């Protein structure tokens, strides 16, 4: 499968059957806020964690998805979500 439509279809199918993805890097203050929320809610198993500083492939994926490397970025079946406060609010609404 190729092209934009094929890639987006794969993306939706992948996220439907797999964990959410969190693009982050360790020393990002905003990322730490989201990571602490995930730990507090005990939902780490719901995620694939992608540290963009450890693996440059993840940074490229993030650029392909959003046009930049701003983290944290939560990716779920609805697409990418940025802003730590929005991500935290979403997680609490879904898992509390």
Each language-model region and where it sits:
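Non-catalytic, surface beta->alpha helical segment in thiol-disulfide oxidoreductase systems
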Residues: 76-96
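Targeting/processing segments of secretory and organellar proteins
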Residues: 2-3, 7-8
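Short amphipathic alpha-helix with an adjacent loop that forms part of the alpha/beta core around
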Residues: 59-65
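Short hydrophobic transmembrane-like helices used for membrane targeting/insertion
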Residues: 1, 12-13
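Local sequence-structure signature of Cys/Sec-based thiol-disulfide redox active-site neighborhoods
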Residues: 13-44
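Short alpha-helical
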Residues: 29-30, 57, 82
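Structural micro-motif
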Residues: 65-73, 84-85
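Thiol-based oxidoreductase modules, predominantly thioredoxin-like and allied folds used
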Residues: 45-58
């Amino acid at each position: 499968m190729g092209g934009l439509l094929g890639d987006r279809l794969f993306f939706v199918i992948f996220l439907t059957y797999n964990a959410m993805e969190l693009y982050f890097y360790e020393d990002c203050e905003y990322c730490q806020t989201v990571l602490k929320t995930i730990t507090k809610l005990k939902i780490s198993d719901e995620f694939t964690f992608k540290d963009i500083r450890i693996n440059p492939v993840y940074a490229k994926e993030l650029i392909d998805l959003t046009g930049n490397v701003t983290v944290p970025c939560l990716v779920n079946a609805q697409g990418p979500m940025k802003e730590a406060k929005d991500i935290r609010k979403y997680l609490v609404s879904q898992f509390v």
